């Protein structure tokens, strides 16, 4: 069969195909618990290999300093507040039921006190659109509307780092370093372009499969490439 093909190596789970989570700085969560109001000062803004948005290091007087998500307009020295009594201001975090309709929000909790799950990517925002009987409707970046428990917390503002994807990589080396921080297999080489020992479709005087590209569901792992258990192939 030749060498172990890429899909088999990925399934084995070596470090090449795993995200380097040992380099990630922190899992960004909302601070404080339900019913309490806390304020912390931003002492630094840093880059985290785990994400494309900057993160803020905040000073926690009675514990270890921790990181939070940065919204557009934040700066070193700003004081951020978490709690129902917080001011309606960029960067502050409140329960959704306390945030006015029409406000831009990010880092929304799926359930109260889970720390934040939705709208965390660079440059994205959601909008509070409606409130009804303890539930709040939010228009997500995808355009769909999702209802949340009114006690779920969210940060007011737009996630920092917008426009990141508009800047070209220019050099393959920069793309390489970006992809090394993820679990992605990059660059991805086509099976046709490989040597015959590296892939069932490899080898030959020109790039072609040289064998049927449809395989059964129970095919052995080294041959299970192409159209797997396909009902049909080709154009309709």
From Swiss-Prot:
Residues 224-236 have a biased composition (Basic residues). GO terms for molecular function: rRNA binding; structural constituent of ribosome. Keywords: Ribonucleoprotein, Ribosomal protein, RNA-binding, rRNA-binding. Residues 1-10 have a biased composition (Polar residues). Residues 1-20, 202-236 are annotated as: Disordered. InterPro entries: NA-bd_OB-fold (IPR012340), Rib_uL2_dom2 (IPR014722), Ribosomal_uL2 (IPR002171), Ribosomal_uL2_arc_euk (IPR023672), Ribosomal_uL2_C (IPR022669), Ribosomal_uL2_dom3 (IPR014726), Ribosomal_uL2_RNA-bd_dom (IPR022666), Translation_prot_SH3-like_sf (IPR008991). Gene3D superfamilies: 2.30.30.30, Nucleic acid-binding proteins (2.40.50.140), Ribosomal protein L2, domain 3 (4.10.950.10). The keyword Ribosomal protein applies. One of its GO terms (cellular component) is cytosolic large ribosomal subunit. Pfam families: Ribosomal_L2, Ribosomal_L2_C. Coiled coil: none annotated. One of its GO terms (biological process) is cytoplasmic translation. The keyword RNA-binding applies. One of the primary rRNA binding proteins. Required for association of the 30S and 50S subunits to form the 70S ribosome, for tRNA binding and peptide bond formation. It has been suggested to have peptidyltransferase activity; this is somewhat controversial. Makes several contacts with the 16S rRNA in the 70S ribosome. PANTHER family: LARGE RIBOSOMAL SUBUNIT PROTEIN UL2, RIBOSOMAL PROTEIN L2. Belongs to the universal ribosomal protein uL2 family. Part of the 50S ribosomal subunit. Forms a bridge to the 30S subunit in the 70S ribosome. This is Large ribosomal subunit protein uL2.
